[in-house]
């Protein structure tokens, strides 16, 4: 057993990293309640240092759900998608050879049309991801499509609010994303010629 003690009279601790020389490393930038439009507000020199230190091989962004609660007009969807596009461009400029996967919003709500801009937002984000050089993973489709949230709630995979996943549901989504990423990696590997 080891203890880690950090003492300081000033400054703020932004994070701690524990790594080894092998395996997959995940750097999580939690933005609880965020809509994914603030990455380009961080000074570019800080991003450059972070990229140089971590050497990322993949960027995964998952946003859209928090923004949906306040969207009632197509013009709001267009503005949001435009802001996401600027942030995707930001990542592509910082890491031009690193693939970016944008995970779209989940299905949301238990009543029809509870989130009237959900379909339009998914379509806009999908288009934005492709136009800005990112891949799009359709979380709503993975769940079962429009209206699937009710079944996820019934099966204990989502909270009764019809918006948030339960720990069990979050684990299932994580496993499905992992499988999709692994399939994509295998598909991108060069195949060996058959020695006939």
Cite the ranges covered by each PLM segment.
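Catalytic His-Asp segment of secreted/periplasmic serine-dependent ester chemistry enzymes
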Residues: 106-196
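Conserved SGNH/GDSL esterase-like catalytic core that processes O-acyl groups on lipids
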Residues: 1-82
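Low-complexity, Gly/Pro
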Residues: 7, 46-52, 71-72, 92-93, ...
